[in-house]
């Protein structure tokens, strides 16, 4: 899907009626005329975080050399206040991924650096994309969206918290997964996420302020006054998001106690954490029901926690723990004001998945969902949901691949003799076995002028049957309890490095943005590839540009090996390299840098040397993994 396709159509852009009007959008794009506030935008982005910034990167690159100074003037709007990675939201520090994995696409591939990416630099790179879009004529409205509705003409009405109303043909919604689920809500009706935390009770809430903090509040407070937490008892509640809090507590010299309900923290492969791994072994308490009260003791503790374990008999006394601070990180709330579910309202019931139709992830598009959209969306019009919100909403969105595939088949049938297509149509609609349908197709006898149409239809039918069989297997394996399209959203991780294990991580948000927009990084044209994150299309384009003599089969084999290698976790990677060596003791395997940390410069050079030799006709059968071995 080419986001903002209508921007190429050069529709006239409305200006204030009291001002002279221009004939085309291009003319208006080069004027300073005051725009009509009631105009219909071609494209509106909601959100200013990473998912939107990745897409702005593609849009900026597409129009930067268009010959028009401000191609987005009057046509593109961006609505949003803060990037959730900004210092004023999540504090300082780092992101638990390398720059190679999460950085914006630029003129060159990022240099290899196994250390974690700086949060400030990542946020600044998002900001640079936003700034560039504004320089190209887009307006940035620092407001919060309160609701979206669809109009009779197919456009969308967007309500802002400042009272402003926008209309737009296309919307990209990238507001993230929502704020941390609150445990403070004792007045208004609870959201679904808040109801899941009704096992936690806060008593005398006014006295708890400043002592009971969500993860972001804790990060900001410890940035501002790290000495405040030194030597204090900090209770961290939450398995995975809590990892950041546990690591920070260790850095501050605090006494950390870690609460989880049933699952243990999942530490990412290749992590460089100093304190969280040990705390995950020694400081875990399995907690079900929890009551938190303020207390004043001689030793200065400010909180008293009464808790029970999962499955504990209600007649047993609760355990007691005194602490200075309680930090919670137990998921995000997609239904809070300003978040995707709250914004969408009734549109939630009209969403469908966006499949990997360009086959970026595999040759079976139905296995991977890269976003969500309002039904009937296309490159010119509609609502597209991207980023972390996709995984949050995916469980309530149903598959539509088979329906669309069948529609395409029925349309293709109109080009062929009715006497043959009628039976095929009946077999498909009645759910005939795949073997029976394929056998029938082979019996067709068509006129000499019709084979191309038959081949198209045959391909479509085979694709439909493969999808039908896949979804049936999924249904059987899950005993009918399919979780919407969640499994296919998670399949985005299957081509990423081993530290990317769930779809809301930045690695998959970046990858899905590229797949959705068809982005081709500038560094590919400059003779480089990022072997850590480039998708199959990017890798194939790079090979074609640099090594034109390499055939499709050889290129595909190389790409498959690159993707398979980078997806291995550290242990499996080392085992693979060792298993391929004739003399396992000949190389110092302990010094191997696994792909989860990125691709070192020496390995990049070795990959390019392999491709150069292949381009020259030399066939080296040595596995690519052997090129990761340190030189003697």
Curated annotation (Swiss-Prot):
Primary location class: secreted
Start and end residues of each stretch annotated as Disordered: 13-34
Compositional bias of kind Polar residues: 15-32
Cellular component, GO, one term: extracellular region
InterPro entries, per database record: FAD/NAD-bd_sf
Superkingdom of origin organism: Bacteria
Protein name: Effector protein hopAD1
Lineage, opening ranks: Bacteria, Pseudomonadati, Pseudomonadota, Gammaproteobacteria, Pseudomonadales
This protein's encoding gene: hopAD1
